[in-house]
């Protein structure tokens, strides 16, 4: 949370240059606090596992967050009981007239499927378009990042020859960007995807701020200038065994997956893996909630509009 300082304090410029989060007194007196309303569109097959992973990260914040779960309308799930979906998940028709502070769209195992061949592609586009006028900040994760780039920038699907799987080192490219506050100069995060996110390609075809990259994995973190759209190409929400379970699954299906990079001790799948990205995941989601959502969203969501957004001091 920010420190509150007098409006004309000489230290203001120094604090701003050092990326210290502060709020001037005139703004602090007008900032009211209420629970943030965040909705998660869960596209993953194992919905209970995925919702647990994201809720874990959203919980590590001093802000109160009211979370709702969203499903693709009338889609049955092979891996999640119908009664769970009916009890805990909303359908788009039921929420389309409401506004939210944040939207998270999860990944989906559709790396080798063309967008137009995704059964729910039209419905997903409808939700992403709706978010422009109903959500303060949207967070697109892994496959959803690729889908979001297609919708917002009409970028074609770019696919790697081999699946990227493992835990990779990333470089913090802008220590003064709010999303990266508190990040180490280099940090680890897991990836599990076929999508290719080249930094040069995104720089030449979008106006995104490229915030973190990896030599092996390409762009990991990017955002629009107004922070209303944030793209995470990896899986910071994964728990310790998610990559292992995917590896075992692929082996069981007769595939020949490579051992996830930098994941198992001594690259030995028989040794219990360790999560080396947990603190990064918590900090990323905490920063998104604070700087992209809470600091920008209007207090009264019923009067949501572009003009309502507050800006960094």
Swiss-Prot record:
Residues at the catalytic site: 142 (acyl-thioester intermediate), 235 (proton acceptor), 237
Site (Important for acyl-CoA specificity): 111
Pathway field: Amino-acid biosynthesis; L-methionine biosynthesis via de novo pathway; O-succinyl-L-homoserine from L-homoserine: step 1/1
Main localization, broad class: cytoplasm
Keyword Acyltransferase listed: yes
UniProt catalytic activity: L-homoserine + succinyl-CoA = O-succinyl-L-homoserine + CoA
One Gene Ontology cellular component: cytoplasm
NCBIfam families: metA (TIGR01001)
Family recorded in the similarity comment: Belongs to the MetA family.
PANTHER family: HOMOSERINE O-SUCCINYLTRANSFERASE (PTHR20919:SF0)
Protein name: Homoserine O-succinyltransferase
